[in-house]
Amino acid sequence: MGMFRVEYLLLGILVIGVRSRDIPNCDFFDTVQLRESEKLCNGSYRYEDVVIPAKLTGKYDYEIDYDGDRVSVPKHIRGCVCKLKTCIRFCCHHKKLMAGNLCSQDVYENLTYEYTLDITQLNGSVIKKHVLNDMVVQQDLPLPCERHYSLDAETSTYDMWSLYENGSLFRHFDQRYLSKQEFCLQPNPTSTGKNYSLIVAFNCIQKPSMKMAYGRFECVRKSRLSNASIPVKFSSVFFMVITIAAYLWLPKFRSLHGKCCNLYFICLAITFLLNVISLFGIFELKTPICYLTGYAGYFTVMATFLWLSVISFDVWRRFAMRKFQVFYKNKRSSFFNYNIIVWSSAGLLTCIIFLVDQFVETNLDNPYNPAVGVFSCWIFTNGWSATFYFYAPLAILIILNCASFFLTTRYIYVENKQNQKVLNNSEPQKLSRNHANYRIYFRLFIIMGGSWFLEIIAFICEMENMWKPLIILNDYINCSQGIIIFVATFCNHEMFRLIRKRIQNRNITSLELTNTSRPVESEKMADVELGK
């Protein structure tokens, strides 16, 4: 038995001894394969015109894929060549082209392109370097991600980028630095119709975390809590579906106010779903289905906040004008008018951004372009252009909602104060009434969209790069709107009483239909008279 254990111990030591040995203080993305390189007598390797000393080589049995995970591969030798000479990362062999999201099978020996690139040094100066003569081309690294899109600066100023001496890339449109793990370079046929190719950067189509807001906050994407927003948003949609179903099922919510609330919930749920589609890059950029998703998403966002304003106005009118009987006689026409106002206004705003996209050039220097479908299947919200088309309309509607909320709560407070003077209630009655008032104020605050006011503040903070905790807090509040609405409207004794009553009425109706197989003569006469 002891001999058996000794054999296993020796085997374990042997396995440890032959394990892969990474190069100390060398990132995997600064290495190249040396499988076909010449090995010198002193243990060094010659890679192109660079001699890599033995201490900068190591045995690897893995590669790092586009998700950052280690993937087991046959053991091979790698050298940390980027410590000796400036490296440039290509997606494939420098004589190949990208075919979709993969490298082409063919090597184009006659492929020619501009081999000189502008390289930004650490001190900020820009020098020109020849790709093949002045740098080491890394072309054996795994592709940086599953799906890519090219930054073609020749055709769009939105696609401007700068390459740095340390191998990182600066993307101009969102002012972001990308490591070599997040991009690669490759010749690409020019889209101007001329018969030559340019080196362009292929960067990743991100799969960002499932957060609400509208896919803009970098600090939320980088937050440790960002993954927690995925189940929160799914839960939010789930609870909104329950709330919508309850409003459709219960007769009480077939009133004017109930119909308006339900349309608000439906628009918000659709907005959530379309936003999810845009965040996950399900559709290819600049395709008809991508444009359709972006414009439909903008339409539902505007409709959501317009219905919220309608609800706020309707609640205020119910309290402030309830003495006027004419208000109660025109509910059907009011609902029709509300629909006309909401859908036509949302449609008009959507038409405006569509026309601007068609006739205004997409340019980073132009702050008036919505850029729907350019960077994601959504309106561009990472710059100040979002102020004109997105946050300005929302800010106006949110301010109107807050004003309606203030006027409504003030009216309730003043009226209750007058009632207390008239009734001269005892202390317990006053306390009970105060608790009831607080519940009313809270529900009004939720229904009238008071929490959305943080959305505008958070956008300004994001643009000015300040108060990041507030931005994250706002994003999670917005992400859980469906849960908040469910708690505020569904979780109360009145709602449970209505559900119980509805179920009991259905049971009684089904029992009566079962026991009465044929109508009696008096019921037939009644039916005839009703049919007259």
Curated annotation (Swiss-Prot):
Cystine pairings recorded for this chain: 26-80, 82-87, 91-184, 92-103, 145-204
Residues carrying covalently attached carbohydrate according to the record: 42, 110, 123, 166, 195, 227
> Which ranges does the record mark as transmembrane?
230-250, 263-283, 291-311, 340-360, 387-407, 440-460, 470-490
* Recorded GO MF terms: G protein-coupled peptide receptor activity; G protein-coupled receptor activity
Record key words, sorted: Cell membrane, Disulfide bond, G-protein coupled receptor, Glycoprotein, Membrane, Receptor, Signal, Transducer, Transmembrane, Transmembrane helix
The UniProt family comment states: Belongs to the G-protein coupled receptor 2 family. Mth subfamily.
Query: How is this protein named in the record?
Result: Probable G-protein coupled receptor Mth-like 11
Gene that produces this protein: mthl11
